[in-house]
């Protein structure tokens, strides 16, 4: 349906794999979402020790594009090191660059993110940075050569939806690479809204894994994302300040 670098994504829903109650719920939610992209924190995967638990042991990863992230990194060097670990372990070379700058809000550090992206691009990675909804930063990263930008809707795990739709619209309208809205989505309504703004996709985790019924929520998110994309492609009617009748005026003379 759309491409990031040389990778073709069939679904506009990218699914995080953490925080599920158990492997069965995780597996069923993945199936219900119909995603073909699974993202995970490299530090959770125990890539070099098969004796340690693997949180994706029940998933046939050959059926998916695996999308590792650098969660836990606080500096560019840490993010680069995590990406190298994933690459050397044979995981997909598309990397979500996540460098957290504040422990309370979990907002990304723009300076360290930029530096990490610069080095990883030089090393040949497909780079997708997680950023705040900052248009100028998104543009600078595009100029650097990133393959997608991933602006937040609101802080990670808050479920607050899109805090600043105007800024998000600026990023989407000016982007020459795919825009994946990442973090803060709480409901299918939020996901639909982001897609109506023109986002290329949504990355979700907590909104599904922490729902009362993650499997149903995975399906609901899939439908919300599809509806939002269809709405964007169809083109909504313009907002007006005066009423306009939907019925024709012909025939009123008979009244």
Curated annotation (Swiss-Prot):
GO MF terms, alphabetically ordered: thiazole synthase activity
Enzyme Commission code(s) on record: 2.8.1.10
Name by which UniProt lists this protein: Thiazole synthase
Localization (cell): Cytoplasm
Described purpose of this protein according to its UniProt entry: Catalyzes the rearrangement of 1-deoxy-D-xylulose 5-phosphate (DXP) to produce the thiazole phosphate moiety of thiamine. Sulfur is provided by the thiocarboxylate moiety of the carrier protein ThiS. In vitro, sulfur can be provided by H(2)S.
Taxonomic path: Bacteria, Bacillati, Bacillota, Bacilli, Bacillales
Record's catalysed reaction(s): [ThiS sulfur-carrier protein]-C-terminal-Gly-aminoethanethioate + 2-iminoacetate + 1-deoxy-D-xylulose 5-phosphate = [ThiS sulfur-carrier protein]-C-terminal Gly-Gly + 2-[(2R,5Z)-2-carboxy-4-methylthiazol-5(2H)-ylidene]ethyl phosphate + 2 H2O + H(+)
Recorded family membership: Belongs to the ThiG family.
Keyword Cytoplasm: yes
Residues reported in the UniProt entry to bind 1-deoxy-D-xylulose 5-phosphate: 157, 183-184, 205-206
Originating organism: Staphylococcus epidermidis (strain ATCC 12228 / FDA PCI 1200)
Pathway field: Cofactor biosynthesis; thiamine diphosphate biosynthesis
Positions of the catalytic residues: 96 (schiff-base intermediate with dxp)
Keyword terms of this UniProt record: Cytoplasm, Schiff base, Thiamine biosynthesis, Transferase
Pfam family name, one: ThiG
Source domain of life: Bacteria
GO biological process, one term: thiamine diphosphate biosynthetic process
Keyword Transferase: yes
GO CC, alphabetical: cytoplasm
SUBUNIT field: Homotetramer. Forms heterodimers with either ThiH or ThiS.
């Amino acid at each position: 349906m759309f491409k990031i670098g040389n990778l073709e994504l069939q679904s506009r829903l990218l699914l995080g794999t953490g925080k599920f109650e158990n492997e069965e719920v995780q597996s069923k939610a993945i199936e219900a979402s119909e995603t073909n992209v699974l993202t995970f924190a490299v530090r959770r995967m125990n890539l070099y020790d098969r004796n340690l638990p693997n949180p994706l042991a029940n998933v046939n990863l050959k059926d998916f594009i695996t999308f590792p992230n650098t969660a836990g990194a606080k500096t560019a060097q840490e993010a680069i090191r995590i990406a190298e670990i994933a690459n050397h372990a044979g995981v997909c070379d598309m990397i979500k660059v996540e460098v957290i700058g504040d422990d309370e809000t979990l907002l990304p550090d723009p300076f360290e993110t930029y530096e990490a992206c610069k080095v990883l691009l030089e090393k040949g990675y497909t780079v997708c940075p997680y950023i705040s909804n900052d248009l100028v930063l998104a543009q600078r990263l595009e100029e650097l050569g990133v393959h997608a930008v991933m602006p937040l809707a609101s802080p990670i795990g808050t479920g607050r939806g899109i805090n600043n739709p105007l800024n998000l619209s600026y990023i989407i309208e000016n982007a020459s690479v795919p825009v994946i809205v990442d973090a803060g989505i709480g409901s299918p309504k939020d996901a639909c809204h982001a897609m109506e703004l023109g986002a290329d996709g949504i990355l979700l985790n907590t909104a599904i894994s922490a729902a009362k019924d993650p499997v149903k929520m995975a399906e609901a998110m899939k439908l919300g994302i599809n509806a939002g994309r269809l709405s964007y492609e169809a083109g909504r009617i313009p907002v007006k300040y005066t009423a306009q009748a939907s019925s024709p005026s012909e025939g009123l003379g008979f009244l």
